[in-house]
A protein has these predicted regions:
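Active-site-proximal specificity loops/subdomain of glycosyltransferases
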Residues: 38-93
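C-terminal non-catalytic accessory extensions
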Residues: 265-322
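GT-A fold catalytic core of metal-dependent nucleotide-sugar glycosyltransferases
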Residues: 83-128
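Short, acidic, metal-binding catalytic loop of nucleotide-sugar glycosyltransferases
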Residues: 22-32
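Catalytic core and acceptor-binding pocket of nucleotide-sugar-dependent glycosyltransferases
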Residues: 145-289
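N-proximal low-complexity "stem/linker" segments adjacent to membrane-targeting elements
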Residues: 1-19
Length: 322
């Protein structure tokens, strides 16, 4: 597969498992990651992760220079709305790439080429519908689809002049996906990621139904994720048989994670369970030993999330947040 460039502007401190994210990038040499950040800590960046250090003010100026109106980019989180425009904003960095994408850093990638092939990039204008990871074919027309009107008005201008977040990068609520559809562009909506449901202390997967256009949350089951030399898999027992499914990536949804590994660099294999990265206890998973593999740690994720959301609602109500 020819190179795909993932663009990541990130301001603030990367999460505590960022080295594991980088390790998963290193195992995908067909892709590059272009990171723009003010976090100057000394990480072991692999050869396919190119870092450009800059302040958020410099990023604001870069984005503003691409538009002839005043943009509402006051906080780093607002960059989410600008993700569909990265092919235009960062165009000078994308020469020679077949495709470009945006992704978050609360992911651990599996083997990308097993899920996004050269043929996929030829067949689709856009692969994915979510802000946490989406790939676009890289050409001048495709990189400017976000500029197209929606229902007779300039949706992108409406979003980019407002300081509030509009989720312009995902789903179908007058978003970039809606614009791609209205322009007759081809979108691959099939999901291959493990998207962790936020409102559970366990690892329940949530998936998007492209027909009903809503989320479905799976029933809770005892399962573990294992990242092994670049391949991300989920294991569980069903009707007495060991089941295994590979994934493009696992998305933690900004979930706090503990690290119980001796190292996070040049690691060959680790287990991912609520809410911990740790070594796998066995050499090979089997029906006989699966019950003895730890599948979770007690955590207060759900209760902390409820408290956080309540506090955000209170701040919005009294005008301290937007």
């Amino acid at each position: 597969m020819k190179k795909v460039a993932f663009i990541i502007p990130y301001f603030g401190r990367f999460n505590n498992y960022f080295p594991l994210f980088l390790e998963s990038c290193a195992h995908n040499p067909d892709c590059d990651w272009l990171i723009f950040t003010d976090d100057r800590r000394a990480f072991s960046y692999p050869a396919n992760v190119i870092v450009h250090y800059m302040s958020f003010a410099e990023m604001q100026a870069m984005v503003q220079s691409k538009f002839d109106f005043s943009i509402g980019l006051e906080r780093p989180y607002k960059l989410c709305d600008f993700k569909p425009a990265y092919g235009y904003i960062f165009e000078e960095y994308l020469t020679g790439y077949t495709a470009w994408g945006h992704c978050d850093t609360d992911l651990i990638f599996g083997r990308i080429r097993d899920f996004i092939s050269e043929q996929d990039i030829r067949d689709y204008d856009k692969i994915g519908i979510f802000g946490h990871c989406t790939v676009f074919r890289n050409d001048e027309e495709n990189n400017r689809i976000f500029l197209q009107p929606l229902n007779g008005h300039s949706r992108y201008r409406e979003v980019y002049t407002d300081r509030k977040n509009h989720s312009f990068d995902e789903e179908f609520k007058d978003s970039i996906n809606t614009i791609f559809e209205s322009c007759g562009k081809r979108i691959r909506t099939t999901e291959y990621q493990a998207n962790i449901y936020t409102k559970s202390s366990d690892f329940r997967l949530t998936s998007w139904d492209p027909v009903e256009r809503c989320y479905h949350n799976e029933k809770l089951k005892r399962a573990i994720f294992v990242w092994d030399d670049g391949i991300l898999s989920r294991y569980w027992i069903e009707r007495g048989e060991l089941q295994k499914q590979e994934y493009l990536y696992i998305h933690m949804q900004a979930r706090p994670m503990d690290i119980r590994l001796e190292k996070m660099e040049n690691v060959q294999r680790f287990k991912i369970i609520p809410n911990t990265f740790e070594a796998l206890e066995v050499e090979e998973i089997s029906v006989d030993n699966f019950a003895h593999i730890r599948s979770k740690y007690f955590n207060l994720h759900y209760f902390r999330l409820r408290s956080k959301n309540l506090w955000v609602k209170i701040k919005k109500k009294i005008g301290l947040a937007y």
